[in-house]
Amino acid sequence: MATSMFAKARKRLRRAAKHLEIDPDVLEKLKYPQETLAASLMVRMDDGSRRSFKAWRCRYDDTRGPTKGGIRYHPKVNIDEVMTLAFWMTFKCAVVNLPYGGAKGGINVDSKNLSRAELERLSRAYVKAFARFIGPDRDIPAPDLYTNAMV
């Protein structure tokens, strides 16, 4: 069985920690995301049918402030990728001293095959599903792979 991206990221953290003076409690906290959420987004398509899309939002760590990270629309996105990218976003914000923690979201969809109206309904369904977790003082979503200004 292949090693997950998230397992590889955690392994890099353990290796780096050996060369740094990191409090063991901090290292323990960084092993897993603070919060990972999943939803099935039901969207009415232009032809009247309904389709379900898997979606995720991972808030990795908010020690430095509200979490922030993009929402990826891609047919191969999965929970492992979302958690891994949220993990790395945590460190990217810390390295440049931004007052944010890391987060990432994803929807398993080939957005190129959706009409503008379907894409809008999908985006609204995502926000509705995760609305109680999103906000300027908690989690700040942003565009990512296969998104555009409309999304």
Question: For each predicted feature, which ranges?
Answer:
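N-terminal ligand-binding/catalytic initiation module
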Residues: 1-151
